[in-house]
């Protein structure tokens, strides 16, 4: 079999695993999944996005990176949050801290799926502060574009394909 055929079969099997609920390492936090074979962290926060929620997820990411032994790419789906309770100063501080924390790490990608202009405002701040660092931050209005950028099959980030919509 050619490498292309094997890759297509593996991709289809991985997508089928996602749809069936297997092949996913769920975290104890709601809305978090880690796909170890793709080195991909997926977070779908719900409710009001606030400082406590972000601080908690950062700690969760650090713990997972320590366990796995290296950084991994991230996908954050902000399309289902109810509201945002954040301030510019906090977002700037978090972005600067994350930038400095990853200064001597290999590059990683962090994709944000955003559907509102209010949410986009905060992601733009985060991306601007992280620019020219190992943290490559991009904002997307389409999940397909995010999956392409992250180089993962769409089934791993599209919640409607996972039956969680």
Name each region found by the language model.
Residues 2-165:
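Amphipathic, Lys/Arg-enriched alpha-helical "gate/interface" segment within cytosolic domains
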């Amino acid at each position: 079999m050619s490498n292309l055929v094997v890759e297509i079969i593996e991709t289809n099997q991985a997508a089928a695993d996602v749809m069936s609920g297997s092949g996913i390492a769920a975290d104890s936090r709601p809305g978090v999944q880690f796909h170890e074979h793709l080195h991909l962290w997926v977070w779908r926060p719900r409710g009001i996005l606030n400082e406590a929620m972000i601080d908690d997820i950062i700690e969760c990411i650090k713990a997972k990176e320590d366990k796995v032994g290296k950084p991994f790419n991230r996908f954050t789906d902000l399309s289902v949050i109810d509201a945002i309770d954040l301030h510019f100063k906090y977002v700037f501080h978090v972005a600067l801290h994350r930038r400095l924390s990853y200064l001597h790490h290999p590059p990683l990608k962090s994709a944000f799926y955003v559907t509102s202009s209010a949410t986009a405002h905060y992601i733009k701040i985060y991306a601007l502060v992280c620019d020219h660092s190992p943290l490559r931050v991009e904002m997307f209005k389409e999940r397909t574009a995010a999956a392409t950028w992250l180089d993962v099959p769409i089934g791993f980030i599209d919640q409607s394909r996972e039956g969680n919509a």
